[in-house]
């Protein structure tokens, strides 16, 4: 057993190193920017080293466990650990945050605070994915909301205060339900609170109480995912945020909600999940159709991409609701896949805006000729978003399809109906993706503009785009990169379910 506190170092390094930013010499933004990038790279290398040399990939149990007593009064422990379910999101967080920091080069106003908030958000997200104590999970969940709110309200667009307030009201409202669920689970059946996740997993609850806990946790995670009808904060938030913030929102923040559904609703409350799983599948199916049919009506480019995130979340819900190892593995693969694709689309939307200063699709047109590199990368990631074979989105959606078809929980006719509606959603997705490309890159509008000369993608934008594109292609060609991490853990989670 390895007793070195790898996870504690990985969690606290970004925020402590970020605090040093305020004491760096005043020599322009270059020093701050490179210092932040170096911290992110060091963190990613540390994480990769710890996982490669100290994590047993064929062991479904919690590994790299750290347990330190923190507050005696409430039996509160600093308890961290990882398994096959959390290792993928943690590596995704490190990768996307490093590239988002590189993408934030145009930010010059209050650069110290901006980069500190990105590193603080990094710590909160890693802490959420590696927490093995329910109260610590809640604290980390709340902690990373503060940097997001400040990043939105200070460096956003014209309606940034409205979107930031909308975001914090929704997420804080959901967090009330999360806190009630955590305290309810921790205080049940004992005079002393038991917030240890392993103890709570082995605890049995009355069905009525388990359903109440399940609904509370579900509301909290539905806001963050987002799941309709609690998704209305998302388009405004993405529409106003700086694109480096959008990369973190789409790539990591939304995935925390899906992770919470699997980690707590599914693993901690299996009986209630078995009852509610048909509703998850129904909501997921509606979500695919709703978002795919609403997206073409969005004039704002970033809002249209935001609705595609809502549509992709529908596949994750169906995978979670299928209660099969195939479906759940597909949902986990979709979490990782869309983390890359969503971050890349928002990055390219932001770099396009930096050049043409247009955000409404009906004002764009003809960008493909002056910006061929951005056109190529945008087209490639749009194809990945609409699940083109050979890319990660296709494999994830296909595995979810097989998961729901092979599920023993549902009768044949409901499965055929759900599959049919999912197929309609997959047909609608190319419509809004390809129409977005047509409005942006084809036609002649840009040539009629007074300042029609624009620069194409530079080395920085090309490096970020290719860095995200390689894993999208890699996972599409060889999905076992991700599936091999989670397959053993998925079997353990599903061993608690009974088809009754």
Swiss-Prot record:
It is an enzyme of class 7 (translocase). GO terms for biological process: ATP synthesis coupled electron transport; electron transport coupled proton transport. GO terms for cellular component: chloroplast thylakoid membrane. The chain crosses the membrane at residues 3-23, 37-57, 84-104, 111-129, 134-154, 167-187, 208-228, 242-262, 272-292, 305-325, 330-350, 386-406, 416-436, 462-482. It is a multi-pass membrane protein. It comes from the Eukaryota. Keywords: Chloroplast, Membrane, NAD, NADP, Plastid, Plastoquinone, Quinone, Thylakoid, Translocase, Transmembrane, Transmembrane helix. Pfam families: Proton_antipo_M. InterPro entries: NADH_Q_OxRdtase_chain4, NADH_Q_OxRdtase_chainM/4, NADH_UbQ_OxRdtase, ND/Mrp_TM. Belongs to the complex I subunit 4 family. This is NAD(P)H-quinone oxidoreductase chain 4, chloroplastic. It comes from Panax ginseng (Korean ginseng). The gene is ndhD.
């Amino acid at each position: 057993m390895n007793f070195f506190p790898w996870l504690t170092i990985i969690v606290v390094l970004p925020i402590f190193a970020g605090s040093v930013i305020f004491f760096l010499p005043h020599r322009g933004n270059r020093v701050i920017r490179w210092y932040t990038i170096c911290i992110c790279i060091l963190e990613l290398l540390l994480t990769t080293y710890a996982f490669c040399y100290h994590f047993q990939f064929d062991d479904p149990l919690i590994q790299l466990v750290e347990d330190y007593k923190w507050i005696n009064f409430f039996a509160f422990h600093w308890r961290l650990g990882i398994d096959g379910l959390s290792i993928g999101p943690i590596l995704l967080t490190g990768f996307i945050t490093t590239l988002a920091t590189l993408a934030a080069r145009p930010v010059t106003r209050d650069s110290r605070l901006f980069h500190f908030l990105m590193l603080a958000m990094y710590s909160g997200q890693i802490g959420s994915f590696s927490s093995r104590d329910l109260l610590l999970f809640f604290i980390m969940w709340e902690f990373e909301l503060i940097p997001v709110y400040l990043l939105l309200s200070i460096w956003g667009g014209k309606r940034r205060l409205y979107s930031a307030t909308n975001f914090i009201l929704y997420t804080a409202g959901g967090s009330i339900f999360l806190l009630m669920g955590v305290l309810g689970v921790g205080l049940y059946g004992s005079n002393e609170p038991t917030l240890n996740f392993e103890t709570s997993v082995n605890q049995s609850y009355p069905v009525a109480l388990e359903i109440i806990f399940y609904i509370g946790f579900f509301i909290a995670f539905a806001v963050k995912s987002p799941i309709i009808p609690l998704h209305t904060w998302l388009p405004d938030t993405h529409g106003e945020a700086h694109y480096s913030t959008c990369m973190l929102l789409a790539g990591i923040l939304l995935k925390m909600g899906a992770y919470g559904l699997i980690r707590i609703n599914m693993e901690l409350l299996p009986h209630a999940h078995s009852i509610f799983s048909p509703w998850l599948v129904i909501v997921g199916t509606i979500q695919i159709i709703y978002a795919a049919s609403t997206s073409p009506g969005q004039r704002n480019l970033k809002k249209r991409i935001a609705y595609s995130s809502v549509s992709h979340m529908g596949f994750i819900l169906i995978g979670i609701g299928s209660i099969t190892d195939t479906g759940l593995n597909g949902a986990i693969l979709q979490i990782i896949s869309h983390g890359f694709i969503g971050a890349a689309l928002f990055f390219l939307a932001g770099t396009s805006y930096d050049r043409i200063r247009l955000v409404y699709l009906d004002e764009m047109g003809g960008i493909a000729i002056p910006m061929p590199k951005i056109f190529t990368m945008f087209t490639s990631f749009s194809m990945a978003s609409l699940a083109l074979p050979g890319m990660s989105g296709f494999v994830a959606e296909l595995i979810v399809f097989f998961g729901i078809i092979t599920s023993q929980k549902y009768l044949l006719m409901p499965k055929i109906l759900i599959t049919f509606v999912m197929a309609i959603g997959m047909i609608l997705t190319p419509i809004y993706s390809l129409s977005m490309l047509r409005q942006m890159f084809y036609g002649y509008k840009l040539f009629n503009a007074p300042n029609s000369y624009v620069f194409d993608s530079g080395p920085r934008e090309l490096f970020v785009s290719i860095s995200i594109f390689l894993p999208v292609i890699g996972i599409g060609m060889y999905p076992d990169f991700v599936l091999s991490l989670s397959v053993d853990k998925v079997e353990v989670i599903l061993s608690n379910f009974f088809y009754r």
